[in-house]
Regions:
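Short, solvent-exposed loop/turn segments at secondary-structure junctions
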Residues: 10-14, 47-50, 93-95, 111-114
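Catalytic donor nucleotide-activated moiety binding site of glycosyltransferases and closely related
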Residues: 30-73
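Structural motif
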Residues: 4, 40, 85-86
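A nucleotide-sugar donor-handling region in carbohydrate enzymes
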Residues: 1-19
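Leloir-type glycosyltransferase catalytic cores
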Residues: 1-2, 115-164
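A donor-sugar binding/catalytic signature common to diverse glycosyltransferases
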Residues: 74-119
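Short, solvent-exposed loop/turn segments at secondary-structure boundaries
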Residues: 17-21, 54-55
């Protein structure tokens, strides 16, 4: 089987996507994937995405209404990643999971914590940027330096670290 393109959506009320028309970005990105690739697209809704007043619900009807031909996943993430060629998302942390599984990513935003390991343009979907283990380790190490416990915050350690 040819490998799949996995598109992972975010909940439309996520604060990370309030600076753009996420529905428009989602639709145009899915159409752009089809423009540059013949791969089957698997659409993965955020696991917490449920119908909510004032927000679009990303279901089969939503995709069909917008002329998007993608299969909606009902699998867990680990299963979705098994036959994956790449993962596309705006700035979801699922992109970190993908990198950890050795799967290339395309991030739609430079606000993604893993953007430095991302192919930047959908038009490059069939020519993805591949990173060395050393490059991946460096970025993941930088991310880990930004993780702090409540106790460390109480002691002011993050502030000492960043503002020394």
């Amino acid at each position: 089987f040819p490998k799949l393109a996995l598109f992972c959506s975010q909940v439309p009320w996520d604060t990370q996507i309030q600076n753009l028309d996420y529905n428009k970005w989602l639709i145009s990105t899915l159409k752009e994937i089809k423009k540059y690739s013949n791969r089957k697209i698997i659409f993965r809704k955020h696991p917490l995405h449920t119908p909510r007043p004032g927000f679009k619900y990303f279901d089969k009807e939503f995709l069909k209404k917008n002329n998007i031909y993608a299969e909606i996943s009902t699998n867990n993430l680990k299963d979705d990643l098994k036959n994956c060629y790449c993962v596309v998302a705006y700035n979801s942390t699922v992109l970190v999971d993908s990198i950890l599984e050795g799967i290339p990513i395309i991030s739609g935003s430079n606000t993604s914590i893993i953007y430095d390991l991302s192919t930047k343009k959908i038009s490059d979907i069939e020519n993805l940027t591949r990173f060395t283990n050393l490059e991946i380790k460096k970025v993941l190490s930088n991310i880990s330096y930004k993780q702090w416990s409540i106790e460390e915050f109480k002691k002011g350690e993050p502030f000492k670290f960043f503002f020394k």
